[in-house]
Amino acid sequence: MSTAARRRLMRDFKRMQTDPPAGVSASPVPDNVMTWNAVIIGPADTPFEDGTFRLVMQFEEQYPNKPPQVKFISEMFHPNVYATGELCLDILQNRWSPTYDVAAVLTSIQSLLNDPNTGSPANVEASNLYKDNRKEYTKRVRETVEKSWED
């Protein structure tokens, strides 16, 4: 069945193949364009550098009018990531726009890694360490980077 959401997701997929943003990749799972597997590489010169973080993106038929649900599969220690892997990111909630595509979502998440919003933490411990003890925060992040290589 070809719906507007599915057509849009196929366009997003073609764009990811022909003009991939640096450090992110994504593609639909076999036989289901509404579920995507994605990978974000930790940005250079950040505690997340060289990490390979896996995510799953779940789209509904209302896409692009409704944002996807995005969740880290890889362990993540970050102020804006819940223990479940779900993200607290404004563009996935109240600041969503139908102009955003898969690439925009993933690059926004990649940017969030080194620029967390500590005013709205999903992980209070990570937020407090980020603000008050950057050395320990960096150590904990580096531990998740090393675990990401094992996934």
UniProtKB/Swiss-Prot annotation:
GO terms for MF: ATP binding; ubiquitin conjugating enzyme activity
EC class: transferase
Name of the protein in question: Ubiquitin-conjugating enzyme E2 2
Alphabetical list of Gene3D superfamilies matching this protein: Ubiquitin Conjugating Enzyme
Subcellular location: Cytoplasm; Nucleus
Protein keywords: ATP-binding, Chromatin regulator, Cytoplasm, DNA damage, DNA repair, Nucleotide-binding, Nucleus, Sporulation, Transcription, Transcription regulation, Transferase, Ubl conjugation pathway
InterPro entries, A to Z: Ub_conjugating_enzyme (IPR050113), UBQ-conjugat_E2_core (IPR000608), UBQ-conjugating_AS (IPR023313), UBQ-conjugating_enzyme/RWD (IPR016135)
Main location (coarse class): cytoplasm
Residue intervals of the UBC core domain: 4-150
Entry keyword annotation includes Metal-binding: no
Any one of the GO BP annotations: protein ubiquitination
Gene Ontology annotations for the cellular component aspect, listed alphabetically: cytoplasm; nucleus
Pathway: Protein modification; protein ubiquitination
Reactions it catalyzes: S-ubiquitinyl-[E1 ubiquitin-activating enzyme]-L-cysteine + [E2 ubiquitin-conjugating enzyme]-L-cysteine = [E1 ubiquitin-activating enzyme]-L-cysteine + S-ubiquitinyl-[E2 ubiquitin-conjugating enzyme]-L-cysteine
Stored CDD domains: UBCc_UBE2A_2B
Organism: Fusarium solani (Filamentous fungus)
